[in-house]
Amino acid sequence: MKIDLNADLGEGFASDSELLTLVSSANIACGFHAGDAQTMLTCVREALKNGVAIGAHPSFPDRDNFGRTAMVLPPETVYAQTLYQIGALGAIVQAQGGVMRHVKPHGMLYNQAAKDPRLAQAIAKAVHDYDSSLILVGLAGSELIRAGERYRLATRQEVFADRGYQADGSLVPRTQPGALILDEGQALAQTLGMVQAGRVKSVTGVWTNVTAQTVCIHGDGEYALAFARRLRAAFNARNIHVSF
C-alpha cells in the first residue's frame, strides 16, 4: 500500500524545511493568504532538493484572516485569481528547473469548493486551462473532485489527520467544537483508519466511508513536526509506502 503525505507550506512557519524531509508533496502558498515571491522561491528550492512534489496552494484574497474568511465571488473572478496564483508559482518552479505537479486550494476556498459546484468548476477550469496534466487535490468525495473529473483532470482525494469530520464527510468548521484534533494518538488512529480501512468516525459518532489518496498534515500546528515523524514511523511499521 502507498499513500501521499502532504503539507501546506510557505505560510511563514519555521518547520517548513524539516517537514520537507518527511512529506512527499508540498502545497506552497501563492501570496493571497500567506507567503510572497521570496518564500515561494525558498520553498520551491527546498522541495526540489528533497525530491518533494510541488503544488500550488491558491486562496481567496484574504491575508488578514489567513484565507479563512468566507467569500462570495463570481466564478469568473475565482477562475482568474486561481489562474494568477498557479501561474506565479509555476513560473518560479520552471525557472528552478522543476515541474509543478498539482494544485490544492487553501482554507475557505477549499471548503466552499467542496460544496459549491460553480466554485469547484471555476477552480477546475483554471487548472485545466493552465496545464491539464496537473493533479487537482480536493476533499475526498467533494464537488471539487467531481469538477476535476468533469474536466478530465487527474484528481487526488484528500483526508486530514488533525481535523474532525461531520457525518456527511465534510470537515467540522473551525468555529465549532471538534474541528481540530489536538491529541496525537487520536489523530494517528484516525489517519490509519482512513488509509487502511477507508472510513472515519464523525464527531457525532457516525462512521463515514472515505477514499484516502493523500493525507494532509498542517505545517502551522504546534506539534506538526513531531506528529509527522510519528505518522511516518506508523506508516513504515505497517508497510505503507509514502510517495507522491
Swiss-Prot record:
GO molecular function, a single term: 5-oxoprolinase (ATP-hydrolyzing) activity
EC nos: 3.5.2.9
UniProt-listed CDD domains: LamB_YcsF_YbgL_like (cd10800)
Catalytic activity from the UniProt record: 5-oxo-L-proline + ATP + 2 H2O = L-glutamate + ADP + phosphate + H(+)
Domain of life: Bacteria
Pfam families: LamB_YcsF
UniProt entry keywords in alphabetical sequence: ATP-binding, Hydrolase, Nucleotide-binding
GO biological process assignments: carbohydrate metabolic process
Entries under InterPro entries matching the protein: Glyco_hydro/deAcase_b/a-brl (IPR011330), LamB/YcsF/PxpA-like (IPR005501)
Main function: Catalyzes the cleavage of 5-oxoproline to form L-glutamate coupled to the hydrolysis of ATP to ADP and inorganic phosphate.
Known partners and oligomeric status: Forms a complex composed of PxpA, PxpB and PxpC.
Assigned protein family: Belongs to the LamB/PxpA family.
Protein name: 5-oxoprolinase subunit A
Taxonomic lineage: Bacteria, Pseudomonadati, Pseudomonadota, Gammaproteobacteria, Enterobacterales
